Amino acid sequence: MKLPIYLDYSATTPVDPRVAEKMIECLTNEGNFGNPASRSHAFGWKAEEAVENARRQVAELVNADPREIVWTSGATESDNLAIKGVAHFYASKGKHIVTTKIEHKAVLDTTRQLEREGFEVTYIEPGDDGIVTPAMVEAALREDTILVSVMHVNNEIGTINDITAIGELTRARGILFHVDAAQSTGKVEIDLEKIKVDLMSFSAHKTYGPKGVGALYVRRKPRVRLEAQMHGGGHERGMRSGTLATHQLVGMGEAFRIAKQEMAQENERIRALRDRFYKQVEHLEELYVNGSMTARVPHNLNLSFNYVEGESLIMALKDLAVSSGSACTSASLEPSYVLRALGRNDELAHSSIRFTFGRFTTEEEIDYAAQKVCEAVTKLRELSPLWDMFKDGVDISKVEWQAH
């Protein structure tokens, strides 16, 4: 077993070797290196063929028409293009947008920008299980609502929202529905023929593909219109200009092809690994699972260890790659805004660790990780005066601390 052990698959995944192999074929002079937009010679035609094949592979995972897939540089760009693109195009219809307090920053910072431009945004608070229900969405809708954006799977706590039911609601009201699906491809079945989602963001690097590439699903029937955010040569039917990076797109296509083929058995294997890990740590006192345990992807276990500082626990677990909060915001020392939205107090939010498992995680690694977590939590609590007070029956929330 090689140390350190990677248990941070929701931050990024390693590129699957089969994906890397396909990508390498599109780089050098011997390979398929042409510009897909070069229409006048065979190098361009061959590159375009590879790109369109990849587009088909992405579409097949989510049962969409390949013409509905727009290439982007990642889910952050897809979120920006979807939300700003719709807001600017449909601004004459209304200026109200609905989203949730637990979205990824790529959605929240985009809606904040639109607020500065004069749009109004309602931020839904989820239940304490981390789920945003259709009833919550319905309560937030107004006459002038033009867009609802609700994530499929949460990046910090792994909870799954019922986008099928929310889609029925938005379609009945004639409101566009955007879903950030960066964390759900290859983990949850998605059928865009059946569900009434108008826009959906995808990322390659959360699904064993390369970083720096993603896609946006833009529904054709009923047709969704967007205002482009990136201008240039008019690539991607004018929605997203810029030379297509054949190797990146081929990588994403292959990653999504593998995801479609292997998702069912991979989910079962990962669920068994997660359960095995949890069984070995659940005896720890004052252990809290963040988010619903049922409406959740098996890859994610977000735990709060009360009376242990999350940062010090991460330092103590130096052989384990885990995170507190999401990778995009874990550099700040603020407690997780997602856990705060669930109603967790600052102490519990600060003591949370996200363990995320994936394709290359082994049973041996799980057992080692669980043992290390138990040792570290026990040791850190032995050093904690708060833990002593708690064990002595003191209600710490009622203690009045003296300032010196």
Curated annotation (Swiss-Prot):
Subcellular location: Cytoplasm
Pathway note: Cofactor biosynthesis; iron-sulfur cluster biosynthesis
N6-(pyridoxal phosphate)lysine: residues carrying this PTM: 206
Enzyme Commission identifier(s): 2.8.1.7
HAMAP family per record: Cys_desulf_IscS
Protein family per UniProt: Belongs to the class-V pyridoxal-phosphate-dependent aminotransferase family. NifS/IscS subfamily.
Protein name as catalogued: Cysteine desulfurase IscS
Organism: Stutzerimonas stutzeri (strain A1501) (Pseudomonas stutzeri)
Organism phylogeny: Bacteria, Pseudomonadati, Pseudomonadota, Gammaproteobacteria, Pseudomonadales
